[in-house]
């Protein structure tokens, strides 16, 4: 967006004072065109500025006339144009100063309103600055030539006035510098213009590095190549002028000018050798990779030589890279710290593409020699680089030119499990390094706001979405990385985060670092959840406590999706259950990994669960997820088979055997307070429970609830051999005893499943009575069962595990689930009514 595009959105009252000497109506007609002219860079009253100002006045009048005619406003605009010409015709520099003041005021107003200027405006201003400097430089070269020719002609005839050959004066006498002074000033202008090009090269390199974290990047080097080539042309012209004026210059002055020109050329040539295609910044040994370099001045200096120079690629350590950067000029050579195969290619000119480049297509790092690391630094924190080097001779004197270019820092790994930590090192270095730094120095602590920008860019680039993170997401991430439950975004604005907090310190109560957890979310979202995130169906970065505050007062079946806080690369469904008394319970279903979602998609899993009704806040789930449902295949397939499908259920939703008064109270208490365990089951027509099992009328008095956060137990009768289990009954979480009065035990101690000995029906003692006298049911009243296997008992101990992996006991109905149990009271929650999502 242009500067005027933002100005037009602001209140006119804030801008009225800017348009006193130049009507706002004319500013509106000129719009973006006005910003594309070098008003801000014509500072001074010399001939160059005067000529440019006159040209701008004429162009402004023509632009206004054309725009007014196109919009049919000629009659109302022509008087303004006439006034403009009458005021500024005699002094066009005054128009330049007026519009420069308006643009500066507009920029200040935009920064106050929007906090930053538009990116395209910045780029255009930088381009205008260089174009103006180059134009001024070319003008000075012409002046120098005229002055030299005047001196030489005057020396022959003695009649030519130098003053008449230089540009006519504007306000007062013209320039009176002699040739040496003018040449020194022109070389100074060349050095200043070269500094603009070198800065632009550094900006390009920095943008290339930031692109590794997802920042948009304009990779084309065509514009930079044109700038470098234009400066080489100026260099050649000045070199000719100094040579032609050797008789008019003192030897010392001439030598100084030549030395300065040579330094300009050397710096320009060595700086124009760039790594256009960077090698992977996380580089695995024995893996092929590509890289490429570009010589911006190759077309001018290499020509069409029969034998192009060869470019070599070598691996260097951080210490070697630092020594190279501090050396005066390119080094003679370095010892490679790794063995790279296929590491030499020719540097060739390509006329069709108008570039000089070398592309390494089959590089392979065979092995790496590790160096001594600093302190507690791990191998995934050790940074290296690829050094690209070449040399060629220049000019009739065969001047040897050596070119070197360092790649961005990279981390070498030998195993895939090092990839995650290596990416953290690269992410930190790319985001927080400075231009012109000593390789590869980077800050140990950075502002949290910069970290938020980095995480947001990385997330959008890695996932491939235009939907970034929201303020609520950053609040949750800050709470996580700082281990601070502050509920205000402002509490973290001025804090700094360290490298150790980012990827060295283990998060409290977890087995992983902040980056390892965040990278797991990136991978899961990229592989399985991109479309869900882009459709804003996933809140994602939100704590369980905040989930409770959002869902507690919502209708039954309201749910949302959040990334697991205690597992790497998991997403869970949190939903509200309302009891008949109106009380609420928030439950979190066991997280799904990328592997789970590759078996059955998230949308289909949500469709499978009937208890999920509305996506928070009030969007029906079918409306929200319909586009993510997989069409169900009906009937037979091409081979005549009836189609099957995999569907998800929550184990709590499976029916329980219904007790009858004739039967003993040998029923597993159902743990309604535990986190439901999502399981995959093939659809079946088999009924459950089996029809042969009689139902109980009541369980209320005989049901025993196990305490929370303990291993599931089986409560057994005194006689361990008097146990039978109904066929196909779900594995019990507890067996309640039923005894005769004379053998009653008031409070039997629960026993672990592993302590119980199960026997087959043939080993059971004969019944000695009927219910409710306390005896166990005979074979004809309750079908005999096969004893549970070791696998069954293992499943019993493992089922209904919490998200953190601990065993959970039974919970009363409508109490918060242990999986999603809140650690703070609702009075401490951030109960914002309008979150960003």
Swiss-Prot record:
Protein family per UniProt: Belongs to the transcription factor STAT family.
Protein name (database record): Signal transducer and transcription activator 6
BP-aspect Gene Ontology terms: cell surface receptor signaling pathway via JAK-STAT; cytokine-mediated signaling pathway; gene expression; interleukin-4-mediated signaling pathway; isotype switching to IgE isotypes; mammary gland epithelial cell proliferation; mammary gland morphogenesis; negative regulation of transcription by RNA polymerase II
Keyword field: Acetylation, Activator, ADP-ribosylation, Cytoplasm, DNA-binding, Nucleus, Phosphoprotein, SH2 domain, Transcription, Transcription regulation
Protein location: Cytoplasm; Nucleus
Motif LXXLL motif in this chain: 793-797
CDD domains on file: SH2_STAT6, STAT6_CCD, STAT6_DBD
Cleaved signal peptide residues: none
Biased composition (Polar residues): 809-825
Post-translational modification: Tyrosine phosphorylated on Tyr-641 following stimulation by IL4/interleukin-4. Tyrosine phosphorylated following stimulation by IL3/interleukin-3. Dephosphorylation on tyrosine residues by PTPN2 negatively regulates the IL4/interleukin-4 mediated signaling.
PANTHER family: SIGNAL TRANSDUCER AND ACTIVATOR OF TRANSCRIPTION (PTHR11801)
Residues covered by region (Disordered): 802-837
GO molecular function list: DNA-binding transcription activator activity, RNA polymerase II-specific; DNA-binding transcription factor activity, RNA polymerase II-specific; DNA-binding transcription repressor activity, RNA polymerase II-specific; identical protein binding; protein phosphatase binding; RNA polymerase II cis-regulatory region sequence-specific DNA binding; sequence-specific DNA binding
PTM annotation (N-acetylserine): residues: 2
PROSITE patterns to which the protein is assigned, alphabetical: SH2
Top-rank taxon: Eukaryota
One cellular-component annotation, GO: chromatin
InterPro entries: p53-like_TF_DNA-bd_sf, SH2, SH2_dom_sf, STAT, STAT6_C, STAT6_SH2, STAT_linker, STAT_N_sf
Lineage, uppermost ranks: Eukaryota, Metazoa, Chordata, Craniata, Vertebrata
Residue ranges annotated for the SH2 domain, each copy included: 517-632
Residues modified as Phosphotyrosine: 641
